[in-house]
Amino acid sequence: MRTFTKALAAAIMVAAALTACNTSSGAGDSAEDYPSKELDWTIAFGPGGGNDIMARTMVDILKKDKLYPRDIRVENREGGSGATGWGYLFGKNGDPYAISTTSGSFITTPLEAKTGWTYQDFTPVGLLATDNAVFAVDPKSKITSWQQWVDHAKRKGKVAVGGISTVNVDFILHAMLARQAGYEIDYVPFNEEGQLQTSLLSGALDAIISNPAEVLGQLQAKKMTALLYTGNKPLAALPEVPTAVSLGYQGLPSMPRGLILPPKAPEFAQRWWIDTMKKVIATPQWKSYVEKNALTEDVRWGADFTTYLQKTSTDFERILRQHGALK
């Protein structure tokens, strides 16, 4: 497990440079005329992942339902386990026209590296849902059950497993499952879902953890085999896949899916986004997205979202230290 890769360090240096160049473009706005400008929406990971899918679903609803009256510019600013994208947003201090979605890396990346920011620096809009994961292998492995996987991993001595980000919920899940089952892992991080899946199917990885939305098509096409689902209840689209709880595994975390503004964003902008996102999550399109992607609705606005982040950060840090990912 690489706790601080050269790639992560380089991405953080780039993020710092972007932060230094950024200036607030929201000066002069008031509650009466907000929003009146183009929105700069940052996705901190590459195309095709859970963060990307959620963000683009939100943007599509905002546009279709005419909830945001100006243009929305969406940019994938991936790199450094989210450090590049959220570092960019951090540099938009006070700007009500910059926004981003969150994932587990929003909490874990600052725990691992000197990003210059933490979740506490940003203006919270809300937690909208939590996301569980699927543990999958290549069908060519001939492994069709969780017990077969555990036996294989123990025989091999150490297995190569992959996920999104260096130290994130994906790593935590891999580490907790391996420790509780009694096998060893070599964790390989990726910034993009496509690269992760390609590495599994090419034989470079023994297994991956991914969100259901990202692998459901591959699973249904029999191009991957799901061995375990980390949610407490069976996945509706894959009812035959056992849950971690049913196999005796406890305490596995979920991915927080939320929305944030830059540090010191105006209170009127925070209020506007809370009110607007309440409309977004009430739409049939959002409810369909939640159901299709096997998300768990968990809605907390403003300060309640901050309280959730505080507890989750404490839990993640404890787990990462237990598994040797943090010193």
Feature map (PLM): residue ranges:
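C-terminal motif of bacterial Sec signal peptides marking the signal peptidase cleavage site
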Residues: 17-20
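Beta->alpha turn/N-cap motifs
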Residues: 100-106, 129, 192-193, 210-215, ...
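Bacterial N-terminal signal peptides that target proteins for export
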Residues: 1-9
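N-terminal (or domain-start) structured segment
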Residues: 22-121, 183-206, 299, 322-327
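An extracytoplasmic/periplasmic, membrane-proximal ligand-sensing/linker region
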Residues: 36-38, 179-180, 185, 267-327
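Hinge/capping helix and adjacent helix->loop/strand transition within the periplasmic-binding protein
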Residues: 88-97, 111-195, 256-289
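Ligand-binding pocket segment of bilobal, Venus flytrap-like solute-binding proteins
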Residues: 158, 162-166, 170-241
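C-terminal lobe and pocket-closing loops
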Residues: 214-284, 311-314, 319
